[in-house]
């Protein structure tokens, strides 16, 4: 089973923390990391926007990654959240075992 990292941005720290806690409680993620105070530049509705956001990294498995993404998308405050998932190419075996166990 592969380990995946999902990267997603939020407008508020409390939104990221609340959604992260739900993902862990539902066993869709083994753990989440929230990174505060990132600066994002993007085009939205014809304008260039520079905004303060926070980012969340979700640690999950190949068997839960699609469910986790759907849950994030359904519960995210943004109209179009930026959600990306990456398969980890090299993972410590003990960490992988822990992630798999936490998401069963």
Model-based region annotation:
Residues 1-104:
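Positively charged, small/polar-rich N-terminal and surface patches that mediate targeting and assembly
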């Amino acid at each position: 089973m592969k380990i995946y990292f999902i990267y997603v941005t939020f407008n508020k720290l409390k939104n990221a923390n609340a959604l992260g806690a739900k993902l862990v409680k539902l066993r869709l993620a083994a753990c989440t990391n929230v990174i505060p105070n990132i600066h994002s530049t993007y085009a939205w509705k014809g304008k260039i926007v520079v905004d303060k956001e926070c980012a969340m990294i979700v640690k999950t498995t190949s068997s839960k990654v699609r469910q986790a993404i759907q849950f994030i998308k359904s519960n995210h405050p943004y109209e179009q959240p930026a959600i990306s998932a990456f398969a980890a190419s090299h993972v410590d075996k003990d960490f992988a075992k822990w992630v798999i166990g936490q998401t069963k």
